[in-house]
C-alpha cells in the first residue's frame, strides 16, 4: 500500500486503496464514497437498514462524509471565498512545489509547468462547484485538496483532486 503525503506539511492526504486516476500527468483524481460512521461501524450511504442487525439504541456518536476525507482526517478549509483568493494561494503554492521539484526531480519541471497551467484553467472554470480540504494540520501553506461532486452512472460521486508533484509516495 502507498500513502500519499503533502511534501510541505507532511500530512497524510490519501492512500492507493481508493480508485484513482492520473489526469494530464499532474492531478490525481481519487474517487470517494459517502459514508456514515457510528463508533467503529461504517455504513455506506444508501445501504438497506432493514437488512442490518437491530439497533440497540445506544448513544454512539456518528459522523458522515466522504470516506477519503474521514479516513485521512482532512479538514475543510473556508479560506477561499472567491477565485482571486484561491488564485493567489495557488501561485504561492506552485512556487513552493516548483522549488522542491527543481531540487528532487528536475526532469519533471517542464511537465509540471506545461500541464499545470492547463489543469488550473479547467479547475478555475469550475471554482464555484468545489470544496477545499487541507491535511490534518490545517496548514494552508501546504496542499489544499479539491472536492467536486460528479454524476457517474447516475450517482453523485465525490471526486478529490490532489496535485501529483505536491505529494510524496510512501510505501507501507
UniProtKB/Swiss-Prot annotation:
Any single Gene Ontology cellular-component annotation: nucleus
Any Pfam family the entry gives: TCTP
Gene Ontology terms: biological process: cellular response to gamma radiation; double-strand break repair; mitotic G2 DNA damage checkpoint signaling; mitotic intra-S DNA damage checkpoint signaling; positive regulation of cell size; positive regulation of multicellular organism growth; regulation of stem cell differentiation
UniProt domain TCTP: residue ranges: 1-172
InterPro entries: Mss4-like_sf, Mss4/transl-control_tumour, TCTP, Translation_control_tumour_CS, Translational_control_tumour_p
Protein's UniProt keywords contain Cytoplasm: yes
Covalent S-S links between cysteines: none
GO molecular function: calcium ion binding; guanyl-nucleotide exchange factor activity; protein kinase activator activity
Keywords: Calcium, Cytoplasm
Location in the cell: Cytoplasm
Record function comment: Involved in calcium binding and microtubule stabilization.
Family: Belongs to the TCTP family.
Protein name: Translationally-controlled tumor protein homolog
Designated gene of the protein: Tctp
